């Protein structure tokens, strides 16, 4: 009998330890996780910046990339998220007009440039200027860019080509991609001879090369606004401030983005 008592006592103690340990674990607050919806052209740089943010704050940021139009519609439809980063002002304005973002948190992060690209092995030389021979350069091929009706890069492309007087010649020869990375893929795979994308996208794909850069005065400034959503976690505004702050500048420069003044 005494033997059983001696055996049961440590077992009871272990059970109590496990029970209290389970309660402590259950009561430990769960760390917040931010869901960031961002324009596809930010894929590489935000991967690095989100890691820096988590390292300094302990708050992970889960990233989801698509065309700004797709993400804005997703938010409007009630999709759960904390931060939205657009490739143009229009889609951010769209959400702000519907009170879906925290206006006070809104920041313009960086800028970009618009470029004409070709497959890396292309020998094409073409200077972008008023009336330049884009249609001739395409030959029987097509031009890939974002859908001008919805995708920011496509809107910038249409504006630039209209300003230069060549839009009407190629408007019916577009491959209308759903985001800038998809547009670039058509060129990198050699499916089309030319495409219009952002300079930062061209810089990360060795299978394409920049033919020329569009003059900045041919289109609206390419800027990336960011904001916390109205129903976001408290850390969302701090994440936006981090992206717009001094600590993030080195990463933005590394990936070729243009510094701007808010």
Describe the role of every protein-language-model region:
Residues 25-79, 86-89, 93-112, 117-262:
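Exported/periplasmic ABC-transporter solute-binding proteins
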Residues 2, 10-22:
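Bacterial N-terminal signal peptides
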């Amino acid at each position: 009998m005494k033997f059983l008592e001696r055996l049961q006592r440590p077992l009871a103690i272990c059970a109590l330890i496990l029970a209290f340990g389970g309660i402590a674990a259950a009561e430990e607050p769960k760390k917040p996780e931010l869901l960031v919806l961002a324009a596809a052209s930010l894929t590489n740089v935000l991967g690095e910046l989100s890691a820096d943010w988590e390292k300094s704050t302990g708050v992970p940021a889960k990233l989801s990339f698509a065309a700004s139009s797709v993400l804005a519609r997703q938010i409007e439809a009630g999709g759960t998220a904390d931060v939205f980063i657009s490739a143009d002002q229009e889609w951010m304005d769209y959400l702000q007009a519907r009170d879906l973002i925290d206006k006070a948190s809104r920041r313009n992060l960086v800028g970009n440039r618009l470029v004409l690209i070709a497959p890396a092995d292309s020998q094409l030389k073409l200077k972008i200027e008023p009336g330049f021979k884009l249609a001739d350069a395409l030959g029987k091929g097509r031009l890939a860019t974002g859908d001008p009706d919805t995708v920011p890069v496509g809107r910038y492309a249409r504006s630039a080509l209209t300003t230069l007087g060549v839009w009407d010649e190629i408007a019916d020869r577009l491959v209308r991609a759903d985001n800038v990375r998809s547009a670039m893929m058509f060129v990198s795979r050699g499916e089309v001879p030319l495409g219009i994308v952002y300079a930062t996208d061209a810089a990360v794909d060795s299978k394409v090369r920049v033919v020329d850069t569009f003059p900045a005065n041919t289109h609206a400034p390419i800027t990336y606004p960011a904001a916390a959503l109205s129903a976001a976690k408290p850390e969302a505004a701090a994440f936006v401030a981090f992206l717009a702050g001094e600590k993030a500048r080195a990463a933005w420069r590394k990936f070729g983005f243009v510094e701007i003044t808010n």
